[in-house]
Amino acid sequence: MIEIELPYPPSVNHYYRHVGSRTLISREGRLYRNRVCAILRAEGVHPLDGCLILEVELYPPDARRRDLDNTQKCLWDALAHGRAYWDDVQIKDLHAYMREPLAPHGMAIIRIRQK
């Protein structure tokens, strides 16, 4: 099982950008992905195999209204890029919770275990 605290993820609207017909990861998205990779490396996380259960507790940085699902894809991609697992298709069960704001930057608590 992996349990780790990560920075609060950017929304999918800020994670990707469109250039012509192409969709790219934005500068903000690359910075977030790199931070997640560095945290996973520092914690010695190795990729999990097989079907996975992902639990996410999101603590936003402020009290603005946010959609629970607006951060998930960028979080999943950053975790896969940082090798918490091989690919986000491994996630078969997802439990996501939006908690009370945690100023000034918010955070995400992630738990990943094999099914």
Which residues fall in each region the model found?
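Acidic, proline/glycine-enriched N-terminal capping motif
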Residues: 1-115
